[in-house]
């Protein structure tokens, strides 16, 4: 089996996690108590969905997931919510006091008390797997727990499970919508370790997803539930090929191989189509070509950056539902002819496609319409650098005056870590710049030391 363990850290990670597991259960026909009436092989454990669920002798399906937070309120919602019987109580780990939006608390003082317990639980889940493939890590880098404890856990996972791939789904601060003053600090400090310890990181940002909800679903005032349900569709599309048998299956390791040209250039944009409300879907016929085009629209991107300002290095298109390879090839051929979608000159093919015959499911009473086919795109584009340069700029404004730094130093951090992390990000911006640069500017001579 190719099991994946999901790790949900901090409020954002947990709430996105709730939306994801709700959707997985719907897709597989698993009830809120973990029973699965449609499963004929009780305790068999060789079904495709066993990559994400483990099956007990009593025929109950338990998610291979861990939820961690430094304060109890968000996890208590899971403990008392609809799916309280789905999770094993040991999988829900909560501390007593909050990281208070402080990376240093999440990473040093409070985080380190809880991290061994987390690794212990993860070890139990891993021992239960026959062929662990990797980890999906969900967190946000603006807060204290997601950034601090998130990085700490990733660092420790690298030590314990060096060869396993780690995919991060990371909520980055938005340009306009801010939830805390020290977001830029937390993000920069956290990205410093995301660079080292994740293989692929998919950037999400609330503002971009708000706009998609407003524009495409006509929700005037989107809530986090609306946002998370949209994000969960993306994550479900990515993992569908692990959970169902399909035509062109895409493995977690394949993402890495196809999307990451250089180890540091691993921050991805994602988009999903069709995002459409039930009222509209009734009147529209969404062909493969149409949904493919709309996945490439800048307004469909789930992070606030414009792919037209950069170049694509690689794209992964995951189709699900009523889609045949012939349609996909035609749609991709059309995309390649468009002048607005530019690829770097050293990567002429640039597309990896996957097809899964399981049509997309939607949460009953949710905002999305039930459609016959959908596509999720994960792309590696040099325009992602906009996300980093925005955060770096805000970081510089605050750090020049050393504002708020004493809170971090007081929790046992050194001021040098700030400048080290900031330099690492400056180097990352530079890397993106070089990757997007054309080769014909007389660079041939000095890239002999690259390889």
Swiss-Prot record:
It comes from the Eukaryota. Undergoes a tyrosination/detyrosination cycle, the cyclic removal and re-addition of a C-terminal tyrosine residue by the enzymes tubulin tyrosine carboxypeptidase (TTCP) and tubulin tyrosine ligase (TTL), respectively. Acetylation of alpha chains at Lys-40 stabilizes microtubules and affects affinity and processivity of microtubule motors. This modification has a role in multiple cellular functions, ranging from cell motility, cell cycle progression or cell differentiation to intracellular trafficking and signaling. Gene3D superfamilies: Helix hairpin bin, Tubulin/FtsZ, C-terminal domain, Tubulin/FtsZ, GTPase domain. It is an enzyme of class 3 (hydrolase). One of its GO terms (molecular function) is metal ion binding. GO terms for cellular component: cytoplasm; microtubule. This is Tubulin alpha-2 chain. It comes from Zea mays (Maize). The gene is TUBA2.
